[in-house]
Amino acid sequence: MFGVARDQHAWVALDGTRYDAIGTDRKLYVVEEGLAYDITPIRETQALTNPFTTNATTSVVVTDTSHGAQKGDFVTFDSFSAIDGLDMNKEFEITSVANSDAYVVTTTSAASGSTSGGGGSGNAKYQISIGPELSTSAIVTGKQQML
């Protein structure tokens, strides 16, 4: 599991299956009989064409106009062609945001070459943005509020 747990809710289904929902600052999980499943909601899906730029390193620049992502968010790519030996059809954490139209993800191995605008056509599924790792509460005008 990614992140710092923020809340938890346990229940038992009518068939006796035990569930536990755990929300972290980064993801939302459901634990069923000891197995954790990532059920973090998707905030947006974008159809992209040739969005990847490689430079023979593990950093891949992704171009997506008005992506709305921030550092630490998660994106899942699907239906793209391999680019410079990299399979981009999986989930990545966004490691930096260049601007409102581009961000960087880091792969586990280096690209075998340098390509500007590759990968063919596919989808980018953006999960809801992450929250702060640290938070505190305070009494403000008689009401408890998260800061």
Positions of predicted regions on the chain:
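Hydrophobic beta-strand segments of well-ordered beta-sheets in folded domains
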Residues: Y19, M146-L147
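Small/polar beta-strand repeat architecture
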Residues: I39-M146
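N-terminal beta-propeller domains
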Residues: M1-T45, I128
